[in-house]
């Protein structure tokens, strides 16, 4: 009887100790894959100049990311100030009577989270300026980060050799030249630019190449995102 009680106590201790020593899977997952929280801000209180800030991750990483994102907003603000100064130089008495739209300049910026998974973050930042006429001029800038370290990635961090650039360019060309509406303006390899200035976004199992509006003349539906599987450049 005493032997059975002793055996039961021993087994209970072993099970308890085992459960204590084995780490929680969920805890490990959360520790290795940060999940950021986003807050929206208006630069200098201007509701037309929006930018994000992140929290809920490593403080040093968040500080690096937030500094870069706020820097993007500062550039937009500088462009906004330049545009408003240009607006003041308009010969209003002559020009505004004929075409009132040409006297109403505007500038705005906003952002969108394109990828937030596996410890990587991609945010696209849009700028739009209107200086009269039928439409304004827009641009898009990608910001890619490591959520653990705050590292700001450029495409040369992904495509590390000239061979990788050529492989990606060839893959993008093969796709674009065979799919409308891109195929109408992509007929040779040189029509597809892939270099150290090319923008990208992280994606599941690869990246997206990101181009500006009208960079491919036959594509008029915003900013082209071209998927490149990781197998192409790894």
Regions found by a protein language model. Give the residues of each.
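Bacterial N-terminal signal peptides
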Residues: 12-21
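Compositionally biased intrinsically disordered regions enriched in Thr/Gly
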Residues: 2-7, 25-234
